[in-house]
Amino acid sequence: MADQPNNAVNYPALAVPHIQLHGVVDDRMYDSFKQQLTGAPVEGPIVVSITTLGGDPEMARAMGDSIRLLRDYTGRETLFLGKVAVYSAGATFMASFPAGSRFLTRGTRLMVHERLMQSNIQLNGPLNTLSYTLKAKLNEIEDSIRIQDEGFADLVAGTRVMLDELKRKATSNWYIEAEDARDLGLVLDVI
């Protein structure tokens, strides 16, 4: 890493992110995100940094929706800066930023995987009603897959990664080093 050029000088806006997130993606991170977003400058680009080993993908999607709405309603530029580890729900959040607005610090790793589910199905009752329980669980699984695939499509939009490739690699936790992410177009640059 020491022999790499200092690309940070090309992106001075990334020096002090307006929103700095770290830890598990959960309700507390979402609350911190909303509070920091409220305190961010009202003009110019908004820079969001994150370091996370993952967490709740729905909280990541909620934060991402806030970023998307900010862009859509104000036209403001939003920049993503991943630091050290952007795993799981962190990559879900990263997908809410256009590929050309994403950056990673040197040595950072991304990790993308399929959504996980742990569930038990209790079948109890008249036989004619049991199929409804199974169908309800199947509907939940199928909708979760659709949500996952929408996020995967957002993550690879405008990159050199094909959606089918991402889906194939995500089955076994795809770890991507910062420089590889840049070369694949998943991020604009590494600083």
Can you say where each PLM-predicted feature lies in the sequence?
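Terminal-region recognition feature
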Residues: 1-191
